[in-house]
């Protein structure tokens, strides 16, 4: 595998993860800002991409974005192809939808709102690039199946091509792209010892709302039979 431009080698990553990065969540990969963008770094819009991490507390990408003091689009994308996979179900979507509604409530308390879009991730990012000239994409590394793995690689490729800075943070004990397991224990221990982050008190909203954003409470997906006795979503 050839690394994308600007990515750190696996070994260096492993060493950094073992020794700690001085941050709450261990940074997996980052594409640094492009030199020609440095003069434009005022008022740059950052996308915080929510996947299955539907919370505001202990959320390193959200905290990092809030500390920049610049506009943030808190984004969740309803990907219909994902919800047609054999290991997804209506009960999972119902839980996710309730969690999205609660996440929107939490973000409103920080002066922002959740932006829910529908479609494939690359198309949504292209739309946001045109409408809000997004310059950063922050997100948690997801441990899922082949579909989400391929989707994440496509996002990294798009960011590289469009010269959009991206950053991944780890949130679990799973460490991708290690050549061996020699440093896994150090990486896991370093992550588990990090303090829990509080929810950001203020999250600057974009200057204009995203056109076409959906009300999470009204979104439906065709993911199979319902389960009335499932666990409710949200943090309350």
Show which residues each predicted segment covers.
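Hydrophobic, low-acid, alpha-helix-prone terminal segments
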Residues: 4-5, 10, 17, 21
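Glycine/tryptophan-enriched, flexible segments
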Residues: 40, 162-164, 183-236
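N-terminal beta-strand-loop-alpha-helix module at the start
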Residues: 43-112
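Short acidic, glycine/proline-enriched helix-loop-strand junctions
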Residues: 148-167
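Acidic beta-strand-to-loop metal/phosphate-binding motif
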Residues: 135-148
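Structural beta-alpha unit
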Residues: 115-131, 161
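Short, Lys/Arg-enriched N-terminal segments with co-localized hydrophobic residues
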Residues: 33-43
